[in-house]
UniProtKB/Swiss-Prot annotation:
The lineage of its organism: Eukaryota, Metazoa, Chordata, Craniata, Vertebrata. Disulfide bonds join 36-66, 46-56, 78-110, 88-100. The gene is NDUFA8. Its main location: mitochondrion. It is found in: Mitochondrion inner membrane; Mitochondrion intermembrane space; Mitochondrion. A motif (Cx9C motif 4) lies at residues 100-110. Residues 146-159 have a biased composition (Basic and acidic residues). Complex I is composed of 45 different subunits. Pfam families: CHCH. This is NADH dehydrogenase [ubiquinone] 1 alpha subcomplex subunit 8. It is a peripheral membrane protein. A motif (Cx9C motif 1) lies at residues 36-46.
Length: 172
């Protein structure tokens, strides 16, 4: 029926949460962006095309899974330098990177040595990229309404306006 909204079940919505603070997210942002680029862009493309978050639950679960795997790898291989780095960011008043360059260098070195991840250059993750996806294109990606007939038939005779043109207020 057109007026009934189908809501997902609780089992469909159940995922493990990424329970971390903003300082941890900020410290890991560059490497996370490089490692989880594809699932994040797939999810954002789905959200933009579908305009309905219920249709993008699977893509959202993949984003969450990638984030959890990413932070587990960081914890397993580079926990100490990463903790020093995000703690430094957390203790600076405005969470600025410039006060923590030494800790950042240690963390980047650890990530490069143990996992082979290179910190992306500034602006590399914000470049426009094409997303290759296996999802089918939505039937109506812009959610536009059907266009009306350009020149509808006018029914009956049209009479001139009673007071003439309404263009000027002083016309009768």
């Amino acid at each position: 029926m057109p007026g009934i909204v189908e809501l997902p079940t609780l089992e469909e919505l159940k995922v493990d949460e990424v329970k971390i603070s903003s300082a941890v997210l900020k410290a890991a942002a560059h490497h996370y962006g490089a490692q989880c680029d594809k699932p994040n862009k797939e999810f954002m493309l789905c959200r933009w095309e579908e305009k309905d978050p219920r249709r993008c639950l699977e893509e959202g679960k993949l984003v969450n899974k990638c984030a959890l795997d990413f932070f587990r790898q960081i914890k397993r291989h580079c926990a100490e330098p990463f903790t020093e780095y995000w703690t430094c960011i957390d203790y600076t008043g405005q969470q600025l990177f410039r006060h923590c360059r030494k800790q950042q260098a240690k963390f980047d070195e650890c990530v490069l040595d143990k996992m082979g991840w290179v910190r992306p250059d500034l602006g590399e993750l914000s470049k426009v990229t094409k997303v290759k996806t296996d999802r089918p294109l939505p039937e109506n990606p812009y959610h536009s309404r059907p266009r009306p007939d350009p020149s509808p038939e006018i029914e009956g005779d049209l009479k001139p306006a009673i007071h003439g043109s309404r263009f000027y207020f002083w016309t009768k």
